[in-house]
Amino acid sequence: MSILRYTASLDNTITNAFEENLTTRGTGSNMGLADTLEVFSIYAQATSASVELSRFLIQFPTSQISTDRTAGTLPASGSVTWKLKLYNAPHYNTVPRSFDLQVSAVSASWQEGTGLDMEGYTDLTDDGIGSNWLNANNSFTSASVTFSLQGGANKAAMSGQSFVLTDSDGTSQTFTFNIANDTVTDGTIGMSSDSNTTDIINTIKSAINDTSLSTLDITASTITAAGDADSEMKLLIKQKSTGLAGNTAIDLSGVAHLSLSGSTFGFSSGDGTWASIGGDYDSTIVKTQSFDTGLEDLEIDVSDIVEKWLLGSSPWPNYGFGVRLTDTYEGYFSSSTGENTATEIHNTSGAQDSYYTKKFFGRGTEFFFKRPVLEAQFNDTKKDDRSNFILSSSVLPAADNLNKLYLYNYVRGRLRDVAGSDTAVVSIQLFQSSGSVPEGSAKTFKASGSDTGVTTLNATRESTGIYFVNIHAESSVVSTTFPNLVDVWTHSSAQFFTGSAFTPKAHSPYQAKSDKTYVMTMTNLRTEYRNDQTARLRVYAREKNWSPNIYTTANSTPENLTITSGSYRLLRIADELEVLPYGTGSVKYSELSYDVSGNYLDLDMSLLEPGYQYGFKFSIYDDFTQTYVEQPYLFKFRVIK
C-alpha cells in the first residue's frame, strides 16, 4: 500500500470579525471544537474601511509519522510526497469565487480550545486555554536571556563595542561600552571606574535599567558570580511584557568577553500572546492554491515543510499549518503607523472586496472521508520479472532489456535482513535448467549500466529483508534443451536460496496496433475484511477471446497475464464516492505490483470506514494511446470492525 493517511490532532479557527452588534470584535473567541474550519475576508461591513478576517490552524502528529518511518512503514525522505488534504464543507452562506489560499508552517505552540460558536463568537477564552486572534495559548510568560561575562574580562578590549536589545513592542536600543566615563544613560555603558567583572556586570545592569530608557520594556535583574569578584558573571535580562513577541534576537559577536548563556539566538521562552495578531507563521516556505468556483477541496504539496519537521538532527518544531487567504485577497487596511493595530492587520496590498466564506470540514466531523488528512504518497511497487523475463534484443531500449529479480527473506512470517545485518552482501547467479533445478555452471549475464559479462552479481538491499538485482541476458543463456533459468542466491559463499525455474521470453514485435481487451478477476478477494487488516489481494488477468492450446487446456492453472503498468481505485458502493483515486501521476501510489504469481496489491483496511461495501476498479496503460483504459469490472467487498 503506497498511501498513509494521518488525521489531524488539533484544529481551530481564529478571527477578528465583528460580533452581531458590529462593534465588538471576536478576537478573544475560540472555535476549537467546531466541526468546520473557516477562511474569509469581509471588507467595509462595519465602517467604510473595516476589515474582518478568519484564518485557521491545523496540526498533525509527527511523532506517529516518525515512528512509521523508523519501522520502515514509511520510506525515507525524498521518496514521499506529502499532501495536505482538506475537504469542502457545504453551507448556506455565500461562497467566494476566484481567490487564492496560502498554507505555511505555524511558528509557535498553540492550544486547540473548546469553543464552538462560529456565528456570534461567544465562546471566549478569557485568557484561558485555547488559541484565538490574539493568544496562541494561556502560558503567559515573558522572554528572558542570560548574559555571560568572561572572568578577568579586559574592559579596554570592550570599549567602543556595541550590542542591541529589542523589546516585545519592537523598540530597540543600542548599548555601547565606554572606558572614558562612568555614564550609564541613553545606552552608554561607562566603565571608567570599574576594576573587575563584578563592577562591569553591575554597570551593564545599571545601563539597561536606567530611567532614561523608559520606552525600552526590558529589565536586567539577577547577577550570579561563579567565584570571586573577577570571576565569570551572569546577568539575567527579561522582557517586561509576556508573549511571543519578546523572543527577539541579540547579536553579541562583536563584543569581547560577552556572550549568551544557554542560547544562541537571544531572548527565549516568551509565550502566551502571538508575536503578531492573527497568528505567527514561517515565511520561508509558503504554498498556495487557486480556487475557481470556491467549492473545491484543498490539496497541496507540503513535502518540504513536513520533512523539515521530521529532520533527525535539527528539526523544525511541528506547530502545524496556518491556512488563510493570501495578502492579495485579505482585506485592504492602511494603519496610520504602518504597523498592525491591536486587532487589524496592516495590509496595503489587500483587496477592497469581500471573500465570504470558504469552509472545510474539521477533525471533529462525523464524515469519515471528509476529515482533514496529511497524506503520504509513495511508490513502493514491486516489479519482479520472473514471469516476464525478456531476453535482450537490439530493437529494445536499454531500459526495456533490463529484468528485475527480487528476494524476500522471510523468517517466521516476518522480513529479516540476511544474517541480521543491513550491510550483509547477498549475490545472485543464474543457471540453465531443463526442468526445475539448476544444471551446469553459472551463466553469464550483464548488470544494469554495464557491458561486461558476469556470472555473479551483488544484490541491492531495498528495505529490511528485501533484495533485488537488475540484469539483462542474451538469448544464449537458454536453449531448446535448457529453456529455463533458475536463480541461486548466496551469502558468505554459501548458497541459501534457490528460486523457482522461469522461462525467459524473446521479444516479438507486432505487425499492427495491438487492440487488447482483458478478462480480470481478484482470485483471493474475500467478502469481508476487518478494519485493522492489511490484505494482499491477487489480480488475475488474461486477454479476452484467448484460445487455449492442448498444453494450457491440460494445465491445472490458467495462464496469468502480467500487467506491467496498471492502477486501481476504490469506490464506496452506497454513493459511488471515490475514496482512493487512481495514482497515475508523478507518484504512482496505486500502481499494481507483480511477481512470479502475477499482479497484486496491498490494501490497509484502516483507510476505509467500517460498515460499508467498497469496490475496486482497474485501469491498464495503453502504450499506443498513452492513456490508462479503465476496465469494465467492479470487485466488491465489505469492511467491518
Language-model features: locations:
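Extended, beta-strand-rich, solvent-exposed assembly scaffolds of outer structural proteins
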Residues: 142-252
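A short beta-turn/strand-edge loop motif at beta-sheet boundaries
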Residues: 74, 92-95, 154-157, 368, ...
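Short beta-strand elements
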Residues: 366-368, 491-529, 622-641
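A beta-strand/beta-hairpin structural motif
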Residues: 297-304, 460-474, 581-609
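Secreted, disulfide-rich extracellular signaling modules
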Residues: 1-144, 253, 261-480, 511, ...
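Internal, hydrophobic beta-strand segments that form the core of beta-sheet-rich folds
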Residues: 320-328, 480-493, 565-566, 600-602, ...
